[in-house]
Amino acid sequence: MALYKAQKAAIIEQFRQHENDTGSTEVQVALLTERINILTEHLREHKHDYHSRRGLMKLVGQRRRLLRYLKRTDAQRYQALIQRLGLRG
């Protein structure tokens, strides 16, 4: 259920803006999206795991806030990120 170090490094490598970038909005959203996908798969199998469901809702809320911030500050980066992650329909 956790995101392994190698997976995390690969996601950071793919979405970073510059060489030392680990905390840009794009990287944070990509990491949250991966964690959300993992938890979603877990909940498909364990339908009554309500504690994990609450954690999933918190992650989705955090991702929503970050995406709202990115849309407000730089709409082009927002659109590019949505396309790359396959979010929003």
UniProtKB/Swiss-Prot annotation:
The keyword Secreted does not apply. Gene3D superfamilies: 6.10.250.3130, S15/NS1, RNA-binding (1.10.287.10). Pfam families: Ribosomal_S15. The keyword rRNA-binding applies. InterPro entries: Ribosomal_uS15, Ribosomal_uS15_bac-type, uS15_NS1_RNA-bd_sf. One of its GO terms (molecular function) is rRNA binding. GO terms for biological process: translation. Keywords: Ribonucleoprotein, Ribosomal protein, RNA-binding, rRNA-binding. GO terms for cellular component: cytosolic small ribosomal subunit. SMART domains: Ribosomal_S15. CDD domains: Ribosomal_S15p_S13e (cd00353). Part of the 30S ribosomal subunit. Forms a bridge to the 50S subunit in the 70S ribosome, contacting the 23S rRNA. Belongs to the universal ribosomal protein uS15 family. One of the primary rRNA binding proteins, it binds directly to 16S rRNA where it helps nucleate assembly of the platform of the 30S subunit by binding and bridging several RNA helices of the 16S rRNA. This is Small ribosomal subunit protein uS15.
